[in-house]
Amino acid sequence: HKALFQHPAGGFDDIFSYFKAFQKFQFAFVAKKELGEIPLYGKWIARIRSVFIERDDPRASLEAINRGIEYIKEGFSLAIFPEGTRSKGPDPGEFQKGALKLATKPGVPIIPVSLNGSYKMFEEPGHLTSANIEMIVHKPIPTEGLSRKEEKALPDIVEKIIVDGVRKLQANEQGVDHE
């Protein structure tokens, strides 16, 4: 199974959540370069074939994206956090539109994932606390053979699916019937 999994970034533990939820998939992750510099964690995510994006260096970012596409062609799924940074609260940040090129170029499906609760693990800087993490894995969105118009509309469609899912999880957490 090859796919691009996309969800809002809540915390450093999101990668662990993915491994638990998607044990049948071989994953590589797209992460900002700074995550690769965290002791132990950085070495671990580098070893599992993560692709590190340097936001200040467009050429290096393009090379990283091409490396991610190669990983997909080799049979890995790729998980990307479309905001490009960790959320410091319950609401997803602004999505980076270019993130979906990793799926549209090789023509693999996008699997939107809504995640709630992981941001709570790092509410206090420097302290790791337990948190209930809930996840909705949405239906795959095919990308093979999309027209330019469909490809251009894709980021907004994926963002809406993810954000609506996060809101549903938040409503459930608060005991509100969202449906």
Q: Over which residues does each language-model region extend?
A:
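Catalytic core of membrane glycerolipid acyltransferases/transacylases, capturing the structured
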Residues: 3-58
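Alpha-helical membrane-embedding segments
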Residues: 1-8, 164-169
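Residue-level preference for the first positions of well-ordered beta-strands
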Residues: 2-4, 50, 75-81
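Non-catalytic C-terminal accessory region of glycerolipid acyltransferases
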Residues: 62-179
